């Protein structure tokens, strides 16, 4: 069986401290998982490895059965891997749309961004007024903008 994400024996150390030691997990499509543990247990380290912010010392990852080695967050995003940060990184005085356009790279046209946002809103039930000022949004709405 292919898993959406499979992690095998990921280890990451910082000097002589092992943040992650032989971590393995398998995620099927549609499943929801949570990483739970004390402060310093290595949860953020593992997420950063999956997202391409950190490189593991050893181990391997697979997306849909294909070896996956992100070089950076851009590489991870190209494989459909994203990350939502605990604290918002939005410009409060700008609209939702302006924040989303600022976050785009590679000279994507405004029309392409609007089409992509429309599709995401439909596919993931992330409906928001794109002309609303971010400061007026609830915390949940801001989280939706971060996801988009």
Model region roles, listed by residue range:
Residues 1-148:
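Glycine-rich phosphate-binding loops of nucleotide-dependent enzymes
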């Amino acid at each position: 069986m292919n898993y959406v994400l499979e992690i095998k024996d990921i280890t990451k150390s910082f000097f002589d401290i092992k943040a992650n030691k032989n971590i393995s997990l398998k995620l099927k499509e549609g499943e929801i998982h949570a990483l739970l543990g004390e402060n310093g247990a290595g949860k953020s380290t593992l997420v950063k490895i999956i997202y391409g912010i950190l490189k593991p010392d050893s181990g391997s990852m697979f997306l849909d059965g294909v070896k996956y080695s992100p070089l950076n967050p851009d590489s991870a995003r190209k494989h459909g891997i994203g990350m939502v940060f605990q604290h918002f990184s939005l410009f409060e005085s700008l609209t939702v749309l302006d924040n989303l356009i600022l976050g785009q790279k590679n000279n994507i046209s405004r029309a392409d961004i609007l089409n992509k946002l429309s599709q995401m809103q439909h596919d993931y039930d992330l409906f928001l007024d794109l002309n609303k000022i971010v400061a007026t949004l609830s915390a949940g709405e801001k989280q939706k903008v971060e996801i988009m």
